[in-house]
Amino acid sequence: TSDDENRNGQCRHGVVHLLPSRAMRADALAQYMLKKRWQKWFLVVGQTQEDQLFAAAIKRAAKRFNLKIVAEKNWTNDFDARRTAQADVPVFTQGEDYDVLVVADEQGLFGEYFDYRTWSPRPVIGTQGLIATAWHPSHEQWGAVQLQNRFKDQAGRWMQEVDYGAYLAVRAIGEASVRSKSNQVPVIRDYLFSS
């Protein structure tokens, strides 16, 4: 899960988190934006609770890396026959001076409409555009090409992040079994949680 609470106050004993949380994803984006010197952010937030949580992670990362959110707007539009992304997005994003547009839309309800449609041509990051993810099909190091090709041959599609998480879980258990020289659950569990 991406929920930060599951790694903090609600963290359970005996749980191993394999995929990045919202805070980790936001920090990764902030670090890259800092490297590119894109320090002024325009934040667009959706209406769902998940969007609010991702926006909070983005704000935390911006503060942590000394980046500035110069504008924040809530997206309340829906696209129907009378309204189009071509018309709404440029108007929504004009009037602000920013380096990058940050979208918080975890369910993908509107974020895809922002790429190449902003008033000023700016990169889009966050939950759409440039995203922080544990896995991407273009990853080529550490045997990733072979893993990707084998997965595609068996599943008939490219590996996604959730698939990679499942692979990591199986790989961790297998590695613990080999290194502990045991197939007993308590021994494997103890190995996984040892320092």
Regions found by a protein language model. Give the residues of each.
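Extracytosolic ligand-binding ectodomains
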Residues: 1-195
